[in-house]
Each structure stands twice: as structure tokens, then as C-alpha cells.
Amino acid sequence: VAYPAMSGYGTAAGDDPVQTAVWRLRSRACWADAAALLEPVTAGAALQRASLLVERCLYTEQGWAEAEDALRTAEALARSDDERGAAACERGQLAYAATLLGVRDRADEARAALGRAAALIAPGAPGRALLDFRRGLLAENLAHSPQAARAAYRRAHAGATAQDDALLLSFTWRHLAGLALREGELAEARHGFTESLRIREELGYLVGTAPALASLADAEIEPEASRLRAEAARLFRLLGGVPTWLAPRLAPPAATA
């Protein structure tokens, strides 16, 4: 089984015991423990370590200073265009997370960093699909442009399919389904959310399973919607309330008069 790193850099972990341990910790919301297993002495290790700590920020709304320090180390060690592009992609994601979660408005920094990454990572390169996905996030959630977001997500989906990046596919399926749901395309939304959930369960990506369950619940009717939401809430509690932004979506719907 390949355990793709969120940075898109060195995506196949193979049978390396350290990478297997990193994946298991990451999938259980133990990003700091996973990062501690990586010595940032090479560009690849530094990038992977930074990506873990950036992901922790997005899921927990904590650890911003540690992520910034790890990112600076990765930027200093990056030599090739792909490495510099991957570091810029992580910087864009950190700025996006800070903006989305209301920590600080860094939208301009996010756009500039992902623009730099696009100039450095060639189409078809391993990190390009992840970059396209993150540009879609900016388009959807910061620029509020669903058409641009859909185009970016589709490019990311095609790239993830070509590179057999199952984890990234779980994200592209979910976000394309979210756009379909907003447009009232229930069958398309259910299909995408179901695929995302299936992949995450197969990979053992526990921290991403509760959001996938909650998303599918939004596209289902009762009693299935409540069953899915209850299972998402169980996993959410199991992981100590992570991701933090999921809590409002797990509250039972208000009773109607």
C-alpha cells in the first residue's frame, strides 16, 4: 500500500518502516509525533515534516509557529524546482488555513505562494495534482468561484488518477461532490462522497473519515443521514474533537415545529 504524503513529494512510502509509522500516526491525528520521526536533514524529509505540521494547523487550529519554523527549514533546504515548488505549495496551504480559520487574513500570500508553485512544478510532475487541488480550495473558499474551483479539482482528480494517489483522490471526490450538492445534483454528490469515504476507510485514514461521513450525511435522507452523522460524531470524539471545524456540522438538526 502506498501512503501518499500531503505535500505530494515522495508520495510512495513503500515498506519503509519509518514511513509506515509516520502514516499511522498522521492518520490518527498525531501529527507532532509523526513529524518527530523525521530528521529534517534532506529537502524531502524537511518538506514532509512541514506538510505534517501544516496539516495539523488545518485540522486543529493549533501549532502555527511550529509549522512556520518547519516550513522555513524546508524552504532553506529546497534546491530543485520541484522541491522549491513543493515548499511554496505548503506555504500557500498554511496561509490558506490561517485565512479560512480566521486566524489571520493571508489570502494574498496564499495566492502568491501557489502561483510560485505553479511556475516551478511542471504539469505532470508528482506535486502538480496536489497544487491543482489547493488552487481549487482557494477558488472555492476564498474567491467564492465554484466554476474555477471545479476546473481545478477536475485537473487534480485527473492527475491523482494518473499517479494512483488514492488519498488525494479521496479529497478530489469529496470536493467535487460538495460542488455538485450545492447545485442540487444529489446523485452525483452521493457518488462522490461515497467514493471518498470508501477510499479513506480502505487507507485507514481515520482523521479524514469523520468529515467524509458527515459530507455523505448531507446528501442522504433520513434515517441514513442521522446514522452517518452519529458515526462521524463517534469518530470525532475518539480523536479528541479533531478536526475542530467539523463540530458544528455534527450537531443534531433543530427540531421543526
For every predicted segment, state its role.
Residues 22-27, 53-69, 95-111, 139-149, ...:
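Short coil/turn connectors between adjacent alpha-helices in alpha-solenoid helical repeat scaffolds
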Residues 1-22, 26, 202-257:
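C-terminal non-catalytic interaction modules
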Residues 12, 47, 82-89, 126-128, ...:
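Residue signature of alpha-solenoid helical repeat architecture, marking inter-repeat boundaries
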Residues 16, 44, 48-51, 86, ...:
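Residue register of alpha-helical TPR repeats
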Residues 21, 49-56, 91, 98, ...:
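Structural register within alpha-helical repeat arrays
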Residues 88, 128-139, 152, 169-180, ...:
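TPR/Sel1-like alpha-solenoid repeat signature
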Residues 41-43, 78, 119-125, 158-166, ...:
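Short coil/turn linkers that connect adjacent helices within long alpha-helical scaffolds
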Residues 34, 67-70, 74, 110-117, ...:
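Tetratricopeptide repeat
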